[in-house]
A protein has these predicted regions:
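Extended active-site neighborhood of metal-dependent phosphoesterases/phosphodiesterases
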Residues: 5-13, 40, 83-181, 203-218, ...
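Generic enzyme active-site microenvironment
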Residues: 24, 69-71, 111, 185, ...
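Structural motif
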Residues: 19-21, 66, 145-147, 181-183, ...
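Short acidic, glycine-rich surface-loop motifs adjacent to enzyme active sites
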Residues: 66, 177-193
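A contiguous binding-surface segment within folded domains or other stable secondary-structure elements
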Residues: 195-200, 208
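N-terminal active-site segment of His-dependent metallophosphoesterases
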Residues: 1-90, 193
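Short, solvent-exposed aromatic-acidic interface loops
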Residues: 278-290
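Active-site environment of divalent metal-dependent phosphoester hydrolases
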Residues: 28-35, 75-78, 110-121, 155-158, ...
Length: 291
């Protein structure tokens, strides 16, 4: 049975039906290749690990109402670090991702991360995007809960940024959904985790995001990817959760980058009455091998 770590908080009373969703992140799909990280003496099959995660999600009872993919969806750039890849070179990885995700028993929502290519992402996963390189931010409701998907990609940078237009949209959206329990998804973590080399790649204007969220007491959780770690921290009434990757993980006991060959993982969030609870599922027996 996979290992699970649970973290629970109370939210405002709800008359809505119980439901669950899953957060999967940093899938790093690279069609036709295996990830061989610089900070690790191994190679890893990110496709195989994601397929294992999807099979585990398919077996969940109850079935999730939806899945959220937290960014860094496709990463063929990690196979060819010497140059910037074109949209056409990214597209096979997004098509492979789409084929794998089609096995889910529920709808999927997608965030953009720093390794993603917006044009290729939009062509494959968001064909009705208003422009070829349009950012991916929006909100949706399920039961009486409100969910916000943000786009923190700053092209060409490992760190993230929310531009003024997106922050204005966020404030308007939250104001229009006041008194709804709200969860926010963003790829980059908005406040430090305490590891300098990871925090150097965080959301550069995290304080601006926190200021916007702080105006709305019904915003409870911010759920992030990017760091390949299972972390939970609190600032005032806001809880930030980071979800491990569906493939390679990062060590949180070193002050320099160190990558580990799994185990693949994902997060379950259960909504039951007045309570939100979450746990991270780790799938042992990773799809990596020494080289």
């Amino acid at each position: 049975m996979p290992n699970a770590v649970r973290y629970t908080i109370e939210v405002a009373p709800s008359a809505s039906a119980d439901f669950r969703f899953v957060h999967l992140t940093d899938t790093h799909i690279m069609a036709g290749g295996r990830w061989r990280p610089r900070a690790g003496d191994f190679e890893f099959d990110t496709e195989a690990s994601l397929r294992r995660v999807i099979e585990t999600v398919r077996a969940l009872d109850p079935v999730p109402a939806f899945a959220v993919f937290g960014g860094d969806l496709a990463s063929p750039d990690l196979l060819d670090r010497g140059r910037a890849l074109t949209a056409e070179e990214y597209e096979p990885s997004y098509r492979l991702l789409a084929e794998i995700v089609a096995g889910l028993p529920c709808p999927a929502h997608f965030l953009v991360g720093n390794h993603d290519h917006r044009v290729a992402f939009n062509r494959v996963l968001r064909p009705k995007a208003p422009a070829p390189d349009a950012p991916q931010y929006y909100s949706f409701d399920h039961a009486r809960y409100h969910f916000v998907v943000l786009d923190s990609q700053e092209p060409g940078q490992a760190a993230g940024l929310l531009d003024a237009t997106q922050l204005r949209w966020l404030r308007t959206d939250l104001a229009e959904h006041a008194r709804q329990p709200t969860l926010v998804f963003v790829h980059h973590h908005p406040w430090p985790l305490g590891l300098e080399w990871i925090d150097s790649m965080s959301l550069r204007n995290g304080d601006a995001l926190m200021a916007a969220l702080g105006e709305h007491p019904d915003v409870r959780w911010v759920i992030c990817g990017h760091v390949h770690l299972d972390q939970a921290s609190q600032r005032g009434r806001l809880t930030m959760l980071t979800t491990p990757s569906t493939c390679i993980q990062l060590s949180k006991v070193t002050q320099a980058p160190k990558m580990l060959p799994g185990p693949p993982a994902f997060r379950i969030v259960d909504v039951a009455g007045e309570q939100l609870s979450t746990r991270v599922i780790h799938l042992h027996g990773a799809a990596g091998r020494d080289v």
